[in-house]
Amino acid sequence: MADWSAEQYLKFEDERTRPARDLLAQIPRLEARQIADIGCGPGNSTELLARRWPQAKIIGIDTSADMLRQARERLPDATFIEANVAHWVPPAGTDILFANAIFQWVPDHLTQFKRLAEGLPEGGVLAVQMPDNLDQPSHALMRQVAQLPQFRKQLAHAAEARAALPHPSVYYDALRPLGRALDIWHTVYHHALDDAAAIVEWVKGTGLRPFLDPLDFPERKEFLEAYTARIAEAYPPRIDGKVLLRFPRFFIVLTR
């Protein structure tokens, strides 16, 4: 895929940061000396970590140069590096591995969770949040439009960019032997957005990217028109004119 756009991502910064706050709130109290923010994006989650542990050394990793540029501007005292978590090894002594909305993009991420957790010291924490929304209209309609004759060839593999998450019991059975405590849960957010176009703008920064990147400009325009029309039907206005974007997310907090 093309590079991520920090500007597009930050159009809904408050809504995107709320799950990071909720994940952070469930991390046990500990004196963290070194923290890694995996998939740090533009630094909004890294900023939360820096506020809670101002004495800690914090490193953020991401694959997007644009996201990292924004993160460095936001937090000049933190360290940000371009790296793929599938091949990245945390620095020795890392106490907390924090990952907000990144591992849903990582193939076989459960294997990565095990690898990362096994490297944590006693009392260290792996904290993860992943969207679990592929069955929601916002994403099902992407796949539906991709099957239209004019897009079918170019987007034959677009849906493969993300796989559905396994059942929570799969994560529990795999991770419970690796720590003294494991907390897993779902939270469903209902984001009140201005209209159907706002939902489209939201997913343009994330979920729509595998469907838009392979298309040229006229094709993207046609895809977005077809998708927006379907979104408007799936998310009717509420009493105040806004629409409710239902957004399930899955959380994991493992303590070694």
UniProtKB/Swiss-Prot annotation:
The keyword Methyltransferase applies. It is found in: Cytoplasm. The keyword Acetylation does not apply. GO terms for biological process: methylation. Pfam families: Methyltransf_25. It catalyses: trans-aconitate + S-adenosyl-L-methionine = (E)-3-(methoxycarbonyl)pent-2-enedioate + S-adenosyl-L-homocysteine. GO terms for cellular component: cytoplasm. Disulfide bonds: none annotated. Keywords: Cytoplasm, Methyltransferase, S-adenosyl-L-methionine, Transferase. GO terms for molecular function: trans-aconitate 2-methyltransferase activity. Belongs to the methyltransferase superfamily. Tam family. Catalyzes the S-adenosylmethionine monomethyl esterification of trans-aconitate. This is Trans-aconitate 2-methyltransferase. It comes from Afipia carboxidovorans (strain ATCC 49405 / DSM 1227 / KCTC 32145 / OM5). The lineage of its organism: Bacteria, Pseudomonadati, Pseudomonadota, Alphaproteobacteria, Hyphomicrobiales. The gene is tam.
